[in-house]
């Protein structure tokens, strides 16, 4: 019995201690390296701010540090706000720079057209000689297989400067740009697409200058980059993550089939593959030096002719029957590069087709697609080239039995299908003079189609894929430096103390360096981290504000002006939001803020030594709204308590006791009590009145004669005085007015006594009826009291037993230590005596030796 009682006592003690000590409360931390995905506007930075499209970008000085994070993060090049912004911004710059001309010439009028002589295309031989930069046909523009463009001469009538007269005009058109009633391109013709365009503004010739810029995150936000070499556009668990404030430089070249002058080329071939379908973007190995050179021979003139006031028509005299003929040739080890693409595809984890590279073929899109899909479409100094890549594909696939070569015939078009939005733009005819442009081929846009036995790499016209390759390994995050975690400390009442010591600012990304550290280690440096965070945000805001001030006159020119303002506003909103949130919780100017709000889930606790703050944030994200609401309610209650406490403190001043405003509340309480008593008396009176009515009595305010019949009050009849007149004297029928109120008061007292007596008897009867229940409750309370006494006795006995055990332990320890000390002292004495006896022993030994 005794051991069981001791075990019960120990269990009770442990349980009580756990209930007291293990209670956890919500603690707010500020300056924690945690984040969530964001989708806010980015702004640009560039080295070349002289071009029209980048004049409002921040100056780039290459001082953008990257910090390695020991975290795991998900990346997706297609579901990515960074790439989506790049696609939209490049499209806007492209549209604004090129300025499509929607004032068609010669509008929608009937034209009489005839095919010019000698415009048939020259047939190409079955085999074509491979050319390079030293080939003579390049300079002479007569390489084998380059035919002439089909041209039709048209004339039409239209009013000119003289509105009442019509004038005849002549013009040369490509046969593919007109629709005629005869199949051979003659007869009555109309310009193709003339009824699908809208007249809105005039246009001039512009160059599409290649612009390189980088995106930067606004203050309070950051960019993460997947640094894994095996990253293929979709990676749910990238373990090599770095944090940066800006992206790498990106190229704004637009084209189909190929990507030119990209910044992602490496000494290897790798593939970005869409997570849900067969869309890919293939980065080519820069080791093979793949280039493309395009040329449009010159000696052509474009002469504007005025049709009428404010409207111009551009005529194209034909000199060499090739007004829009251009061509491109490819240099580098293309055959080996394409072979490496096939080998890389066969090893890709997403690929499920044949591993035989001989059955993996490059193919062009099917017939019937838009020209931008059927042909390779690119921009060369503001002109749009459409190149037939059949010869080129036969060459890289080594199809010697078909026409093949390393160059492709191209033509320039005015009617262009837009690449980002559905629509058609019409541009001015080609400018005069020779056009040349050189580009480095860095990627291939393709769709992978596999049926198990054969795989086709079909070239694609998805221009947007180019920017997914450029920036697909980045993601934008919003830094959330205010997380919650449970701790055993509870808030104590004290005034918040501001830290006044300065800290060295490492930049906005400095505090993210601890993102991979354990929660306990990261929380130890909160003071420096939070101040670094705030200082970095303020610094970035100031830089943006300076740029906006310098360029406020040009904000309307490009998309960057608006994005800079948006970034500035976003940064201020985030900073104010964080500070307002901390203030609403009563945690302003605190890095670690303990609260009185209990932790909602005791089973959900962090591993301070092994868990990062980012991992903890993902686990408790669903509790954020409830905890935030509880913290706000606790702070409101705390403010109410402080207000009441401050009001009580006002009584410490002796002069406040004589302040009438301090007593108004208590005076009000007294008035309320008096009014309540009066109301109670009125209620009792009404109850008694109703009670008398039920028993057949007349109301107490009936006439005196009727009332005196029930309560007989006899009075003596008074004699009139001698001086009274006849009018003053009279018979009052024996009634006196003054005795009646006294008897009535006695009557009310009697009724009140009976009422109270009745209430007392009723309550006593009710209690007597509930005596069994009271006895049962009394017995239960007695049993509980006995049980508590028993447990208290157990607890007292256990405490006495523990105290006795401690006293016995203390006695034993004291005796043991005393014995050990005595033994140690005796041993030290013996050693000392032995040391002191050494000279004597030596002397005695010497004496014996001498004897």
From Swiss-Prot:
GO terms for molecular function: structural molecule activity. It comes from the Viruses. Residues 294-327 are annotated as: V3. Residues 502-522 are annotated as: Fusion peptide. The keyword rRNA-binding does not apply. Residues 1-24 form the signal peptide. One of its GO terms (biological process) is symbiont-mediated suppression of host innate immune response. The keyword Ubl conjugation does not apply. The record marks 501-502 as: Cleavage. Residues 565-581 are annotated as: Immunosuppression. InterPro entries: Gp120_core_sf, GP41-like, HIV1_Gp120. The chain crosses the membrane at residues 670-690. It holds the Pfam family GP120. A motif (Di-leucine internalization motif) lies at residues 850-851. Residues 453-459 are annotated as: V5. A motif (YXXV motif) lies at residues 697-700. Residues 647-668 are annotated as: MPER. The surface protein gp120 (SU) attaches the virus to the host lymphoid cell by binding to the primary receptor CD4. This interaction induces a structural rearrangement creating a high affinity binding site for a chemokine coreceptor like CXCR4 and/or CCR5. This peculiar 2 stage receptor-interaction strategy allows gp120 to maintain the highly conserved coreceptor-binding site in a cryptic conformation, protected from neutralizing antibodies. Since CD4 also displays a binding site for the disulfide-isomerase P4HB/PDI, a P4HB/PDI-CD4-CXCR4-gp120 complex may form. The surface protein gp120 is a ligand for CD209/DC-SIGN and CLEC4M/DC-SIGNR, which are respectively found on dendritic cells (DCs), and on endothelial cells of liver sinusoids and lymph node sinuses. These interactions allow capture of viral particles at mucosal surfaces by these cells and subsequent transmission to permissive cells. DCs are professional antigen presenting cells, critical for host immunity by inducing specific immune responses against a broad variety of pathogens. Some HIV-2 isolates have been described that can infect cells independently of CD4, using CXCR4 as primary receptor. These isolates may have an exposed coreceptor binding site. This isolate is from a Gambian case of 'neuro-AIDS'. This is Envelope glycoprotein gp160. It comes from Human immunodeficiency virus type 2 subtype A (isolate D194).
């Amino acid at each position: 019995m005794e051991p069981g009682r001791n075990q019960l006592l120990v269990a009770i003690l442990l349980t009580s201690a756990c209930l007291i000590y293990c209670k956890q409360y919500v603690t707010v931390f500020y300056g924690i390296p945690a984040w969530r995905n964001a989708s806010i506007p980015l702004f640009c930075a560039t080295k070349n701010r002289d071009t029209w499209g980048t004049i409002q970008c921040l100056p780039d000085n290459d001082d953008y540090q990257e910090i390695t994070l020991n975290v795991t993060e998900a990346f997706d090049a297609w579901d990515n706000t960074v790439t989506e912004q790049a696609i939209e911004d490049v499209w806007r710059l492209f549209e604004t720079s090129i300025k499509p001309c929607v004032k068609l010439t010669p509008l929608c009028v009937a034209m009489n057209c005839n095919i010019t002589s000698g415009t048939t295309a020259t047939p190409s031989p079955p085999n074509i000689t491979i050319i390079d930069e030293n080939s003579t046909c390049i300079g002479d523009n007569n390489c084998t297989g380059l035919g002439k463009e089909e041209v039709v001469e048209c004339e039409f009538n239209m009013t000119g400067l003289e509105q009442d007269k019509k004038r005849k005009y002549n013009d040369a058109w490509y046969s593919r740009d007109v629709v005629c009633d005869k199949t051979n391109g003659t007869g009555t013709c109309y310009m193709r697409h003339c009824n699908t365009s809208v007249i809105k503004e005039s246009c001039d010739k512009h160059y599409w200058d290649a612009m390189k810029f980088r995106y930067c995150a606004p203050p309070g936000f950051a960019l993460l980059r997947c640094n894994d070499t095996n990253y293929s556009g979709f990676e749910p668990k990238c373990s090599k993550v770095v944090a940066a404030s800006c992206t790498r430089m990106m190229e704004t070249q637009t084209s189909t089939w190929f990507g030119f002058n990209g910044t992602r080329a490496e000494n290897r071939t790798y593939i970005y593959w869409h997570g849900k379908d067969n869309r890919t973007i293939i980065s080519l190995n820069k080791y093979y030096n793949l280039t493309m050179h395009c040329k449009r021979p010159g000696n052509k003139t474009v002469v504007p002719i005025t049709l009428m006031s404010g409207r111009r028509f551009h005529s194209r005299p034909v000199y060499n029957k090739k007004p829009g003929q251009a061509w491109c040739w490819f240099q580098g080890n293309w055959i080996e590069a394409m072979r490496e693409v096939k080998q890389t595809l066969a090893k890709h984890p997403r690929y499920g087709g044949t591993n035989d590279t001989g059955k993996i073929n490059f193919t062009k899109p099917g017939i019937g697609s838009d020209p931008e899909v059927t042909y390779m479409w690119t921009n060369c100094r503001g002109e749009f080239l459409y190149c037939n890549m059949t010869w080129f594909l036969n060459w890289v696939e080594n199809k010697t039995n078909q026409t093949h070569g390393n160059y492709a015939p191209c033509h320039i078009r005015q009617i262009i299908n837009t690449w980002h939005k559905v629509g058609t733009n019409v541009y001015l005819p080609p400018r005069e003079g020779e056009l040349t442009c050189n580009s480095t081929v860095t990627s291939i846009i393709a769709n992978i189609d596999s049926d198990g036995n054969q795989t086709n790499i079909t070239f694609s016209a998805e221009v947007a894929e180019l920017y997914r390759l450029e920036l697909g390994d980045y993601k934008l995050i919003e830094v959330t430096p205010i997380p919650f975690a449970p701790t055993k400390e509870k808030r104590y009442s004290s005034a918040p103390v501001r830290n006044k010591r300065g800290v060295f600012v490492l930049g906005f990304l400095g505090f993210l360096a601890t993102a991979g550290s354990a929660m306990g280690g990261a929380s130890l440096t909160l003071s420096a981290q939070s101040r670094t965070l705030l200082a970095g945000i303020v610094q970035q805001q100031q830089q943006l504000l300076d740029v906006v001030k310098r360029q406020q006159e040009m904000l309307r020119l490009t998309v960057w002006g608006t994005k800079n303002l948006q970034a500035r506003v976003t940064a201020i909103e985030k900073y104010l939001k964080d500070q307002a949130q901390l203030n609403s919780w009563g945690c302003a100017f605190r890095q670690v803020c303990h609260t009185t709000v209990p932790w909602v889930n005791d089973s959900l606790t962090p591993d301070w030594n092994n868990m990062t703050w980012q991992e903890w944030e993902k686990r408790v994200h669903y509790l954020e709204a409830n905890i935030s609401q509880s913290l706000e309610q606790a702070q409101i209650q705390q403010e109410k308590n402080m207000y009441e406490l401050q009001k009580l403190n006002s009584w410490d001043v002796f002069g406040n006791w004589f302040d009438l405003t301090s007593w108004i509340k208590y005076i009000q309480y007294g008035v309320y009590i008096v009014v309540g008593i009066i109301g109670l008396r009125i209620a009792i009176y009404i109850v008694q009145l109703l009670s008398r009515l039920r028993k057949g009595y007349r109301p107490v305010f009936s006439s005196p004669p009727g009332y005196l019949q029930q309560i007989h009050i006899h009075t003596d009849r008074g004699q009139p005085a001698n001086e009274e007149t006849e009018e003053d004297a009279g018979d009052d029928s024996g009634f006196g007015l003054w005795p009646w109120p006294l008897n009535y008061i006695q009557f009310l007292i009697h009724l009140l006594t009976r009422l109270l007596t009745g209430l007392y008897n009723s309550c006593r009867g009710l209690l007597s009826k509930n005596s069994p229940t009271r006895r049962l409750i009394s017995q239960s309370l007695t049993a509980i009291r006995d049980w508590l006494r028993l447990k208290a006795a157990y607890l007292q006995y256990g405490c006495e037993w523990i105290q006795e055990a401690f006293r016995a332990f203390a006695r034993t320890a004291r005796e043991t230590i005393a014995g050990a000390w005595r033994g140690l002292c005796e041993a030290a004495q013996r050693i000392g005596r032995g040391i002191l006896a050494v000279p004597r022993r030596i002397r005695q030994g010497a004496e014996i030796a001498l004897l």
